[in-house]
């Protein structure tokens, strides 16, 4: 039998166990709050920046090229960019990518932070630029740190440091969002990698899978970048070969300028930031509104403050409730449209230069593996016609310029839609882009031709679409430039239809359809004429055999004359010298030239033909003998028409 003391000890232990269990249960029920570093967040959610799956290598090359172009254009430097990637370790999918440019470079004290620290960038201003979040280069550094033990190699020669070049070996501390500087070295003259006065070079090793589809996307991205940046030299190198996209023009667009925000898009955060910028100057709210926002005059600012009923005092003396009233009044007030002179569109001359020599990378699949012949080459597509149109609009209280171009015919054999935003090619998610909606909604009859004509004359077995415009040999280019592009996702691959954006894109495309309509109608007439000429050539030998003996004329000369008249009739002009003889035979080698009177009415050139009686007599003779021959043959067995039989077949 247990003693009383033993029972008490056991009871106490049971109570302690119950209390401990209750405390543990309470701890499990509590929510733990932790702060995650920016770098850790983006690495864990890499799809937000597009770095996912097979697109890692594509996004890395894209970000490097865009950074290089921004660096050159910001200081009005004609870009020379070299980009390469090669497979280091096939078993582990390790790739070495390298990019070098002749831009302004990065000061040596800013290189580690600019390359490795997330949300640290010079792009967080109201300005048109390719970058959106300033995370592209940081994602490359973080992924290199996460998947490999090889640091980033960086060379930088900044224009601010009198042509001194520094070399860095860097990694990212993903847990703290801070750079790890393994090496920093001032290079001697014989150790320098960058040839120009300034520039930037980076080498990184990434783990990434590369499928044939992704590889083609990389090739297409580089090709399309050269279209909207024809003033740049792009050198692109892979294990399959090296290609160079030459500079087609030395004209560069004016660099984009920083601009004050528009008051129509004001919110509490923007207003507080504007007040903080004037905190040391003890400025009134009136001064803050006039100096921190565009299109706000002194009278307009007074009107806003009066309507809000908050009075004029030092900007830092307003409560949050009073500032909210200011924001609400600004959203209700009508302001002038934002300025567009700070934007940097491509422009007609530059885009036309890109369209006239459209570079595209071609993979040679017939190369012998034993030969040292490169698989990659550049094909240049030259159209017969290009056209350009642009519109200025406001989207979400931000100025936006819509540019549209068309390249038609020539080396272009099929339809293709090119999409660009702030001079960046957009290759993915075309089906959800506003440009695809515009193509679908603007009908082909804007060209003055019917869908039936297009489908009959431009039937393309490779085209899977039943839309008439997609049967034409035509490339359509859409470019949107703004201080903030309405992307659908952070990956910057498709643009949303916001505000009046679609309306102005439709207007541009309609303009271009009208401009190319004359060329398309001309080609349709030429195809019809060729069909009729084949028919004439089929019947001419039959007519010559029937009438040559009755009129005692050499069949060869008669056939030649008939063929010449048929060709000139189809072309609508006679090219032989003028004949003044009254007596003229159909077999004479000289045929009178048709006289053309050319007039221009409202920009339309028209030709009026004046045919001499001699030529008219010749045509009447042909018609007479053709009619007589047709009646004669109708009494005999019908002669089969091989042209029609071919058409039926």
Q: What kind of feature is each model-predicted range?
A:
Residues 2-20, 35, 209-231, 241-273, ...:
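Charged regulatory segments coupled to nucleotide-binding catalytic modules in large multidomain enzymes
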Residues 2-78, 109-116, 254, 259-265:
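Bergerat-fold GHKL ATPase/HATPase_c domain
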Residues 19-26, 121-273, 313-329, 336-338, ...:
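GHKL-type ATPase core
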Residues 68-98:
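ATP-lid-like helix-loop hinge signature
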Residues 101:
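Acidic ATP/Mg2+-coordinating residue in the GHKL
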Residues 105-107:
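A short glycine-centered beta->alpha linker in the GHKL/HATPase_c
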Residues 288-306:
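Helix-hairpin-helix
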Residues 319-391:
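C-terminal extensions
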């Amino acid at each position: 039998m247990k003693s009383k003391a033993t029972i008490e000890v056991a009871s106490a232990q049971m109570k302690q166990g119950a209390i401990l269990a209750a405390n543990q249960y309470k701890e499990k029920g509590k929510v733990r709050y932790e702060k995650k570093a920016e770098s850790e967040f983006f690495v864990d959610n890499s799809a937000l920046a597009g770095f996912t799956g097979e697109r890692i290598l594509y996004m890395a090359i894209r970000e490097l090229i865009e950074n290089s172009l921004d660096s050159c254009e910001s200081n009005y430097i004609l870009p020379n960019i070299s980009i390469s990637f090669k497979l280091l370790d096939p078993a582990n999918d390790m790739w070495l990518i390298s990019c070098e440019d002749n831009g302004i470079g990065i000061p040596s004290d800013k290189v580690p932070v600019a390359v490795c620290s997330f949300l640290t960038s010079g792009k967080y201003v109201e300005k048109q630029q390719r970058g959106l979040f300033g995370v592209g280069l940081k994602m490359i550094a973080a992924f290199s740190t996460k998947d490999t033990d090889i640091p980033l190699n960086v060379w930088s020669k900044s224009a601010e440091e009198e042509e001194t070049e520094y070399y860095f070996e860097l990694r990212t501390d993903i847990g703290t969002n801070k750079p790890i500087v393994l090496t920093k070295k001032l290079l001697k003259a014989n150790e320098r990698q960058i040839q120009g006065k300034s520039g930037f070079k980076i080498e990184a090793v990434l783990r990434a899978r590369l499928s044939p589809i992704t590889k083609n996307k990389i090739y297409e991205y580089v090709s399309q970048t050269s279209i909207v940046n024809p003033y740049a030299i792009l050198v692109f190198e892979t294990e399959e070969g090296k290609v160079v996209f030459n500079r087609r023009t030395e004209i560069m667009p004016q660099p984009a300028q920083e601009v004050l925000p528009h008051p129509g898009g004001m919110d509490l955060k923007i207003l507080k930031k504007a007040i903080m910028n004037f905190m040391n100057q003890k400025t009134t709210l009136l001064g803050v509104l006039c100096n921190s926002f565009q299109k706000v005059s002194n009278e307009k600012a007074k009107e806003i403050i009066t309507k809000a009923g908050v009075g004029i005092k030092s900007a830092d003396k307003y409560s949050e409730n009073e500032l909210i009233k200011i924001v609400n009044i600004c959203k209700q007030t009508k302001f002038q449209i934002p300025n567009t002179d700070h934007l940097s569109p491509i422009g007609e001359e530059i885009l036309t230069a890109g369209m006239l020599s459209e570079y595209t990378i071609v993979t040679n699949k017939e190369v012998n593996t034993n030969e040292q012949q490169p698989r990659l080459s550049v094909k240049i597509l030259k159209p017969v016609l290009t056209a350009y149109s642009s519109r200025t609009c406001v989207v979400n209280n931000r100025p936006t310029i819509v540019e549209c171009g068309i390249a038609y015919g020539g080396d272009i054999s099929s339809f293709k839609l090119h999409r660009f935003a702030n001079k960046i090619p957009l290759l993915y998610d075309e089906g959800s882009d506003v440009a695809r909606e515009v193509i679908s909604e603007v009908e082909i009859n804007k060209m003055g031709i019917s869908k039936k004509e297009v489908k009959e004359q431009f039937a393309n077995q490779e085209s899977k679409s039943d839309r008439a415009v997609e049967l034409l040999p035509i490339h359509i280019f859409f470019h949107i430039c703004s201080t903030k592009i309405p992307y659908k996702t952070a990956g910057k691959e498709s643009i949303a239809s916001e505000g009046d954006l679609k309306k102005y894109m439709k207007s541009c495309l309609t303009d271009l359809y009208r401009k190319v309509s004359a060329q398309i109608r001309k080609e349709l007439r030429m195809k019809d004429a060729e069909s009729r000429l084949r028919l004439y050539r089929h019947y001419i030998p039959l007519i010559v055999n029937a009438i040559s003996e009755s009129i005692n004329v050499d069949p060869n000369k008669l056939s030649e004359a008939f063929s010449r008249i048929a060709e000139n009739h189809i072309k609508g002009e006679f090219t032989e010298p003028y004949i003044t003889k009254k007596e003229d035979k159909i077999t004479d080698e000289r045929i009178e030239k048709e006289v053309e009177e050319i007039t221009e009415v409202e920009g339309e050139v028209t030709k009026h033909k004046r045919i001499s009686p001699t030529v008219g007599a010749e045509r009447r003779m042909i018609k007479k003998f053709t009619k007589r021959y047709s009646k004669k043959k109708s009494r005999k067995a019908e002669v089969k028409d091989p042209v029609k039989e071919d058409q039926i077949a």
